[in-house]
């Protein structure tokens, strides 16, 4: 195998001798770097001129063998073919290089990661198409090799990497916004999201783009169960083009306002009388700073002393100034309206900082974008001054959770070396702290009032005072008993591999980060996202991290069926608690029993004629409950009545889009695993999703097409029974049996109640 590998590498390197001998690298790569303005240069892995110049082939083969023995990397021979456009397939330039890729990387990301390793931009990688060739066979697309979304590079290329050539067709399209919506794919959407997340966080991006926050997180982290549908990709492409165009217009408006202010200062300077012979005076530094060419600013002898070589009428200058002011006012009003509609003011457009006109424009821009290293101390001082909690500050400053803010303050990462997502959060906090103190206090007060109103709307009693109907008691009891076992912390195996186990567990169970963080560590989705991003080395000295990872390790040590049951119970609990009205959550059990007794009395009055003495009817109320435990206890009947009000049957427009994408990708007959995945992703009960698919199958069979919902919410409770194409499943039969049994039970109770009434009357 090693001999064949060296022979193949020698053959391929001999074919690349022309490119290797060129110290500047392939011309296609140089043109691409100059066109996209990539700062990567040729210092990256894919730089032929910098990396392979003067390096013997035997040494490079030895390096590849060393990496292979470690078992983490695989060499892949790539041939990049550069086309002028996507229609005319005239190959202009091509070059070939080896790329080292991770074995555990997904196979469908091979093209993208190979181009990024070679130094190409995200937009170029998103628009590329790849073919794989084994030996001298005809090259085929990667999708023809396997359609498994979880297939890795090691699964597909472990045994044939030495005879495999990856041919990448790169079309010249300068920007993603210039790409037609029909050509958008799952890869282009993921790269566009990565580019957008450099300037904003996921929550603020989800408020603007047609994708939800959970879907954005899944696509970026490559945990989405399937590729985004073509319709969703086209919708995102249209939105991305409009978003970029609007952003460019705002940048142009800002630059126009800067130029108008500079022009106003220049006109005021030019209207001042200049003593002496101005034709002999050199241009002043102020004039040179406003002009691009010094010769233009030199006044001519035959002109008025205060004018430039190309005079501008004051009328035109005034018109430009008025137009700039109107545009600035319109921009400010639009931004104010957007801030009021978002409930979170300072995420997308930070408040403008007053710029001093005596500073150069480059310095002004840099001071606005830089984050001070004192930001962490500023936040602590602000928390002490205002007397607010970390949760309130995290919500109003950068719209995240208290757990994420606590982790940021604990680590105190240097802003100069911080990641893009952390920089976005730090910049948002810094922009918020630059507001006046009175404005910040007003925002804190508004947030407190909003929280109090939300709490009062839920009822006077806390949620924990409700009857113990929350299903995930198995999880809490199990973890609570394990928490008491203190000696387990010393023997527990906690190392850096726990982060990979967390990702594998979420992928296996098809659960979201929010659900896993809640059941495993009682944390938020933002906390888990930051934990997986930093992947800090576990150490008992870091007590907070060690305790959180210990909780996760205890949860992962549970048997797999028990973990799946906890996921299911927690998902159902979220549905149930979200669907119960506030007046039902906090009503005491005694009052509910009295209401049930009154309802049963009314039913008895409707079924049987009232007795001649109505004043004795209330005495029958207390006699009914003693007979109920013989069939069903009051707590069980109370639970049944609550379960009837809990289920959610409405499907939002966003969930409809995901379901329609699933129909286009998979079909109208999802299996149990797919239904469970959709239920967890859309936060909907399973029977709601089942009814939706049954209704769609009915319309396809009887009308020849799927039902058009016209972008409106759908309530599956409004579906008629004849509009559901379904088989008699066991769950449906059990439900019908329970319904018939409950009807018979009510009839028996009513008969017994009437018998008691007649007996009392006779007595």
Swiss-Prot record:
Residues annotated to bind DNA: 361-448, 484-571, 645-704
Effect of residue 530 to Q: In DHDBV; stabilized DNA-binding and increased transcriptional repression
Domain of life: Eukaryota
Description of how the protein assembles with itself and partners: Interacts with CUX1 (via DNA-binding domains); the interaction inhibits the attachment of both proteins to DNA. Homodimer. Part of the nuclear protein complex gamma-globin promoter and enhancer binding factor (gamma-PE) composed at least of SATB1 and HOXB2. Interaction with CtBP1 when not acetylated stabilizes attachment to DNA and promotes transcription repression. Interacts with PCAF. Interacts with sumoylated PML and HDAC1 via the CMP domain. Interacts also with DYNLT3 and POLR2J2. Binds to EP300.
Annotated phenotype, changing residue 366 to L: No effect on DNA-binding or transcriptional repression
Predominant location category: nucleus
Species this chain originates from: Homo sapiens (Human)
Tissue: Expressed predominantly in thymus.
Effect of residue 619 to R: In DHDBV; uncertain significance
Protein name as annotated: DNA-binding protein SATB1
